[in-house]
Each structure stands twice: as C-alpha cells, then as structure tokens.
C-alpha cells in the first residue's frame, strides 16, 4: 500500500479534512481550488489545502486563535501518527493573535517526534514570528520579501483593582516567559529581547536571519523542501 492509499484510508482522515475544509471555507474569501485525483479507491476530490496536507504541508494563515490552533494541533498529531520520522512543513503568513493559542501550537511542535520546519511567506508578526522561530533549528526559512515583527504581548483588564493587578502580573509573567523562549530560539540575550520588544520591531528576511529568528532566506525551493 502506498503512502497515498494508507493516509486516505485512515478512518480519521475524512474527519480531519472536514474540519480543515470548514476552517478554510470560513477564513478564505476567495474560492478555494479543488483537485481531483485517481487512486486505487477510485476518484476523490480535495481542496488544495487538504491535498498539500498529504504532502505533510500545513498552512498557518490569518489570526492565531483557539479554533485555528486546535486545527493546527490536530494536523500535527495526525501527521506524527502517520509517520513519526518524516519532517512536517509549516508555512506561516499571520498577523499573530492569542498568546495561549500560539503556545498550544508551540508546545505541540516540541512535543511531537517529527521535526517541524517553518517557512514565512508574506509576513509573520507577533505570535506568527514566535512560531516561525519555534521551528527546528536549521530548518527555519523566510521567502525573500517576507517581513517579520516581534513585540511584547498586549492585554487589558477591567473590574476591581485587585483583578486588574492580578491580570497585570499575569501579563508580565507571560512576557518574561516569551522573552526567555525567544532568547533561546534566536541566540540573543534576554536583555536584548526585552529591549527590542518594547515596541514593534520590524525586520526584513535578511535581518530576521541575522537576528536568529530564521536560518535561511529562500529565493528558490531547496531539495529539503
């Protein structure tokens, strides 16, 4: 049985594709292209994102929020179950979003056995840049005209003064943890990370490489991808 037949025969594949298609239909304003393929099981049609998932390609596009994070996590776990020794490729074009949703993806990337390469196309900002840097070291890429931005987490609170104080402490604690992770992923000192993220810190692809957020700027597809 080929990898194609084995994956599509998996009883969880159709459920995963159904959830994937639902999210794509609600997050894509344009018509999603469909591909039709022949296999030993007959003719099947897939949206283009589902077809690429079979090639171990995951797209992280748009706002990082809980529902999207759950889908990304499910795809990572599914691909690990299919082949724990083969790389997964995570393409990122995201303005960022929820810290908790982003950390769920980050922790899963580290939890699973396959190495996860990250590729920025367009832009990776805020939590998007954090997940870009979270890829396997040596396998973090950005396309030539991609942009990256890092900054500190933002948040707000209302209500009693004690509740506001509790929320403020939690934000500071989260910021410190994110800075520690970025320092480890980039090779920069925590002090430099703290200084740079005080305001929006923009980098082009070459600057992102120099900073340590990525390992290589791509103009053409390498053999590893």
UniProtKB/Swiss-Prot annotation:
One of its GO terms (biological process) is protein quality control for misfolded or incompletely synthesized proteins. SUPFAM superfamilies: ClpP/crotonase (SSF52096). It catalyses: Hydrolysis of proteins to small peptides in the presence of ATP and magnesium. alpha-casein is the usual test substrate. In the absence of ATP, only oligopeptides shorter than five residues are hydrolyzed (such as succinyl-Leu-Tyr-|-NHMec, and Leu-Tyr-Leu-|-Tyr-Trp, in which cleavage of the -Tyr-|-Leu- and -Tyr-|-Trp bonds also occurs). Its EC number is 3.4.21.92. Keywords: Cytoplasm, Hydrolase, Protease, Serine protease. PROSITE patterns: CLP_PROTEASE_HIS. CDD domains: S14_ClpP_2. The active site is at residues 126, 151. One of its GO terms (molecular function) is ATPase binding. It holds the Pfam family CLP_protease. One of its GO terms (cellular component) is endopeptidase Clp complex. It is found in: Cytoplasm. Cleaves peptides in various proteins in a process that requires ATP hydrolysis. Has a chymotrypsin-like activity. Plays a major role in the degradation of misfolded proteins. PANTHER family: ATP-DEPENDENT CLP PROTEASE PROTEOLYTIC SUBUNIT, ATP-DEPENDENT CLP PROTEASE PROTEOLYTIC SUBUNIT, MITOCHONDRIAL. NCBIfam families: clpP, PRK00277.1, PRK12553.1. Fourteen ClpP subunits assemble into 2 heptameric rings which stack back to back to give a disk-like structure with a central cavity, resembling the structure of eukaryotic proteasomes. Belongs to the peptidase S14 family. This is ATP-dependent Clp protease proteolytic subunit. It comes from Psychrobacter arcticus (strain DSM 17307 / VKM B-2377 / 273-4). The gene is clpP.
């Amino acid at each position: 049985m080929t990898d194609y037949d084995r994956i599509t025969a998996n009883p969880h594949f159709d459920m995963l594709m159904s959830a994937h298609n639902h999210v794509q239909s609600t997050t894509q304003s344009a018509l999603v292209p469909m591909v039709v393929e022949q296999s030993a099981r007959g003719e099947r049609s897939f949206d283009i994102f589902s077809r690429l998932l079979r090639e171990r390609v995951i797209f992280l596009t748009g706002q990082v929020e809980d529902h999207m994070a759950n889908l990304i996590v499910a795809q990572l776990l599914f691909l690990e179950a299919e082949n724990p020794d083969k790389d997964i490729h995570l393409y990122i074009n995201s303005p960022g979003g929820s810290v908790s949703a982003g950390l769920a993806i980050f922790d899963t990337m580290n939890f699973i056995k396959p190495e996860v390469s990250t590729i920025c196309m367009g832009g990776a900002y805020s939590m998007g840049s954090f997940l870009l840097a979270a890829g396997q070291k040596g396998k973090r890429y950005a396309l030539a005209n991609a942009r990256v931005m890092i900054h500190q987490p933002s948040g707000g609170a209302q209500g009693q003064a004690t509740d506001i104080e509790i929320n403020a402490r939690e934000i500071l604690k989260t910021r410190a943890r994110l800075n520690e992770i970025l320092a480890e992923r980039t090779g920069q000192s925590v002090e430099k990370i703290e200084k740079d993220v005080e305001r929006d810190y923009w980098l082009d692809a070459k600057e992102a490489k120099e900073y340590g957020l990525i390992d290589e700027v791509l103009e053409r597809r390498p053999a590893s991808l």
